[in-house]
Amino acid sequence: MKKLMLGNEAFARGLYEAGCKVVSSYPGTPSTEITEEVAKYDEVYAEWAPNEKVAMETALGASIAGARSFCGMKHVGLNVAADPLYTAGYTGVNAGMVIAVADDQGMHSSQNEQDSRHHAIASKVPMLEPSDSTECKEFVKLAFELSEKFDAPFIVRMSTRVAHSQSIVEMEDRQELGLKPYEKTPQKFVMMPAYAKGRHVFVEERTKKLIEYAETTPLNRVEISDKAEFGVITNGAAYQYVKEALGDKASVLKLGMVNPLPEKLIQDFAAKYEQVYVIEELDGIIEEHCRNIGVNNVKGKEIFGYIGELPQSVIAEKLLGEKKEFAALEDNIPVRPPVMCPGCPHRGLFYCLKKLGVTVSGDIGCYTLGAAAPLNAIDTTICMGASISGLHGFNKARGAESEHNTVAVIGDSTFMHSGMTGLVNIAYNNSNSTVIILDNSITGMTGHQQNPTTGKNLKGDPAAAVNLEELCKAIGIKRVRVTDPYKLAETEAAIKEELAADEASVIISRRPCALLKYVKHNPPFKVNTEKCVGCKMCMKLGCPAISMRDGKAVIDHTQCVGCGICKEQCKVGAIE
């Protein structure tokens, strides 16, 4: 049977068909749907882990136990999982282990545009890269086989376009493998120096064998055109752009195995043409490899640069000098920047922080939008968990000057991911810092995934729920309080009180995400135009349900969830 599938959905199907038994991931766009889709198969155990490091260690443990395993994450998640990744490159596997890392070329939903191929190279872990949904499924299945053949975890690199675009996929039956035997082998899995030295020798020998495999594998294929004016070496989503933009005007070497890269295959292909262009998104890894192996008739980054995606129009203009028209919407869609939803519980908190003129150390989540107009409340956003650690450093640097006017904001899921250790640091090192945990009862930004505080697991079954108040107290924070961000006066008073204290404190701003299905909304509010004076104070909240018409505020009843923040804000009582 054939089916139209997203790349991530096809990836999940590949996990299922390959006989994968254990899946542990942390949600992160554009990788999230892989784990959500594979969780629908009863034959696969799937979970959300607290962070990517835990997910990778769980998958490695399952592999050592004899089960094919998988962990998935976005590109910045691989930074978090780098510690086990680099050592897993030494230990190798028992049963096959596959890692998905989804890069976000163009930074559609990310804080940086790093190229995950660097991690594969540095960790000496092989990496494959599909270009469409069919390849997603087939590459995953092959990755498990190669993982067991070469005794290595295999990374499959995804991109936003491949993950979230669709193509036809042939459905096949699941391969039931059973558990491989487990035998105690400390020289393989106990990475103390005496054993690790021997494994490093193994890794280098394995890399040589992988390079030999890269020379002949069908993953790397040459597509010769008799009308070719030049050659192109490409990979991933860029391959699709190349084929559409250049057609038969170029011969193409498509690299589906991007670490390690072949040598002779590239040399032989490049020798056929006076000029070869390397078209790869982000860093010039393939281009640099070409030059390292003596292929000097290549150009790449000097033409295409290091930033963002490489759409068909760019490739056609740069290489053919043509401004070609490609299938697209006739009219430009008006820009609609992301905003907090109507009724978002974070809005009231950020309004209070802005009103008080507080310096805010931000984090990763929906609440990052607190940095946008009209709230403009957040001063810094670095990475998961950095809000708390950064606050501690900020206050240690500036002392009393900042201690009573600076806070950290972090979501419940992000706090469980990597915020806890920062709070331990605050307690342990006697930091006079105020942390605000934005508890909206879900992992919101990536699409409502469960987390260790929600009381449910990935499949929706009951699970232990971490009590944030008790956890913060156990860490050593004596001042812990809960506020409702819909109540502006209460929230503002709590912030003032905790900032005035001479010890560390935690405010848990608790209100479920307004988009959760079980959340009951209040009747929508409306504006009494006779009372409205057009002061625009309600507009300062940045609620999408509120706009101005003929000098008066208007509330869209189809969007309003009745949170009441605007009513509390209105000084003339015009909102009823």
PLM features: residue spans?
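Flexible, low-complexity linker and terminal segments
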Residues: M1-N8, P130-M340, P345-H346, G357-V358, ...
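Thiamine diphosphate
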Residues: M1-S133, R161, S225, E287, A371-I508, Y518-K520, ...
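Short acidic, glycine/serine/threonine-rich loops at helix termini
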Residues: I34-E37, T58-L60, A81-L85, M107-Q114, ...
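Short helix-loop-beta junction
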Residues: E37-E43, K243-L253, E470-G476
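A glycine-rich helix N-cap at a beta->alpha junction
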Residues: E43-A49, T91-A102, Y182-K188, Y428-S441, ...
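Conserved thiamine diphosphate
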Residues: D104-P153, S159, M191-K197, S402-H404, ...
